[in-house]
Swiss-Prot record:
<feature type="binding site">
    <location>
        <position position="169"/>
    </location>
    <ligand>
        <name>(6R)-5,10-methylene-5,6,7,8-tetrahydrofolate</name>
    </ligand>
</feature>
<keyword id="KW-0545">Nucleotide biosynthesis</keyword>
<dbReference type="GO" id="GO:0006235">
    <property type="term" value="P:dTTP biosynthetic process"/>
</dbReference>
<comment type="subunit">
    <text>Homodimer.</text>
</comment>
<feature type="binding site">
    <location>
        <position position="51"/>
    </location>
    <ligand>
        <name>(6R)-5,10-methylene-5,6,7,8-tetrahydrofolate</name>
    </ligand>
</feature>
<dbReference type="GO" id="GO:0004799">
    <property type="term" value="F:thymidylate synthase activity"/>
</dbReference>
<keyword id="KW-0489">Methyltransferase</keyword>
<keyword id="KW-0963">Cytoplasm</keyword>
<feature type="binding site" description="in other chain">
    <location>
        <position position="177"/>
    </location>
    <ligand>
        <name>dUMP</name>
    </ligand>
</feature>
<comment type="pathway">
    <text>Pyrimidine metabolism; dTTP biosynthesis.</text>
</comment>
<keyword id="KW-0808">Transferase</keyword>
<feature type="binding site" description="in other chain">
    <location>
        <position position="21"/>
    </location>
    <ligand>
        <name>dUMP</name>
    </ligand>
</feature>
<feature type="binding site" description="in other chain">
    <location>
        <begin position="207"/>
        <end position="209"/>
    </location>
    <ligand>
        <name>dUMP</name>
    </ligand>
</feature>
<feature type="binding site">
    <location>
        <begin position="126"/>
        <end position="127"/>
    </location>
    <ligand>
        <name>dUMP</name>
    </ligand>
</feature>
<feature type="active site" description="Nucleophile">
    <location>
        <position position="146"/>
    </location>
</feature>
<dbReference type="InterPro" id="IPR020940">
    <property type="entry name" value="Thymidylate_synthase_AS"/>
</dbReference>
<dbReference type="GO" id="GO:0032259">
    <property type="term" value="P:methylation"/>
</dbReference>
């Protein structure tokens, strides 16, 4: 996870102090890219323990097109609690846009299903894209999409994914985002008969909140450990058919977790 740690170090040393929506304040840089070879291990941060259960359940929740936190709460995941209304609703956030992008004629587009179809029938297409950034729906979302837009790319039988993330909370959010999209790439590769390639992470406003700086320094003081492996149930051939028990993380030996407040 050297690319992630290099980003954190760079922002600590060269970031610009900025105000932000939450009123917390950040150190920020604009425009950064990291790359992770998914054949070299599963990119889950080892310099602190990450809660894989939350990552997996959130991704499955997105893929089901769900926008109510009930499923997450039932599975012990609280990462969306601060933004939900009294009924647990979040508005037309990620899952809605991924699975039910509204059309002008009143219909919807299932972007994930379309991506799978195109990967199977026209893998050289440069249009295998999923967007969560629906300008017309932003005002109805509890939180505008941070990881806004991703594209799949096939070369020599290997599937790569590039994510554009407009806003990147380096300490708390980015480790989740890396693992989530790496996992999605593994899943998409399996159901389309491809091998995993790279996950490319392109960041817009990459920032450390000022109340995360000491935690970031503590993390940078730790020696990275070998990356774990991620094994998927080979019997699953439908991207919407995965369940939590279909994922097995092996060899994960992280340093202890480091607590930090969430900026809401």
């Amino acid at each position: 996870m050297k690319p992630y740690l290099d980003l954190m170090r760079h922002v600590l040393e060269h970031g610009t102090r900025k105000d932000d929506r939450t009123g917390t304040g950040t150190l920020s840089v604009f425009g950064w890219q990291t790359r992770y070879d998914l054949a070299a291990g599963f990119p889950l941060v080892t310099t602190k323990k990450c809660h894989l259960r939350s990552i997996v359940h959130e991704l499955l929740w997105f893929l089901q097109g769900d926008t109510n936190i009930r499923y997450l709460k039932e599975n012990g995941v609280s990462i969306w609690d601060e933004w939900a209304d009294e009924n647990g609703d979040l508005g037309p956030v990620y899952g809605h846009q991924w699975r039910s992008w509204p059309k002008a004629d009143g219909g919807v587009i299932d972007q994930i299903a379309e991506a799978v179809k195109t990967l199977r029938t026209n893998p050289d297409s440069r249009r295998i894209i999923v967007s969560a950034w629906n300008v017309a729906d932003l005002d109805r979302m509890a939180l505008a999409p941070c990881h806004a837009f991703f594209q799949f790319y096939v070369a020599e039988g290997r599937l790569s994914c590039q994510l554009y993330q407009r806003s990147a909370d380096i300490f708390l959010g980015v480790p989740f985002n890396i693992a989530s999209y790496a996992l999605l790439t593994l899943m998409m590769a399996q159901v389309t008969g491809l091998k995993p390639g790279d996950f490319v992470h392109t960041l817009g406003d990459a920032h450390l909140y000022v109340n995360h700086l000491e935690q970031a320094r503590e993390q940078l003081s730790r020696e990275p450990r070998p990356l774990p492996t991620m094994t998927l149930n080979p019997d699953v051939t439908d991207i919407f058919g995965f369940r939590f028990e279909d994922f097995t993380l092996g060899g994960y030996d992280p340093h202890p977790a480091i607590k930090a407040p969430v900026a809401v």
